[in-house]
């Protein structure tokens, strides 16, 4: 979208832009699809994931994938961008925003971060009504500190509002003009792969618990 990364719309025959997009959190549902859409828009993609998912993201088209838990991940990605021009970054997952700030602060090109998620405080999500006010205060503090860090590094950002796709040109271009043919000819694949837990409403709680524990490169599914 124009007020985010402003990438061209995806096509079946993209013109190479000569630029590289950083997708932090590539093994998530958002990340897997972002990688493919960016490539279809003419961009090279560098991503992050746990080592077990590196080969999967490369099959989706990422040229390089780094371990987000590595203590040298920021320096490693900056090094990978040494002879590249950044198209910006998409931050997905806890801690991703500040890491992306550090990376883009050391790169040439578009220093803009499209935020798909906000950082959850270390205390986790509120478990009851009394936990909600301090939770929101911690979230606000995290967001403000992130904005300050962005400014110091010459980086700008904006939180993504998914509902915007319903009222602008991007939603139609992707869901009506691009995806039907791309899915049919295999240039875009549904990702991540589904992990079916079982059938029936009685399996929903099990699926929720599994999702809460954390999954990567999988989409938890309950059939009805």
Describe each region flagged by the PLM:
Residues 1-224:
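Terminal helix/beta-alpha structural elements that buttress the NAD(P)+-binding lobe
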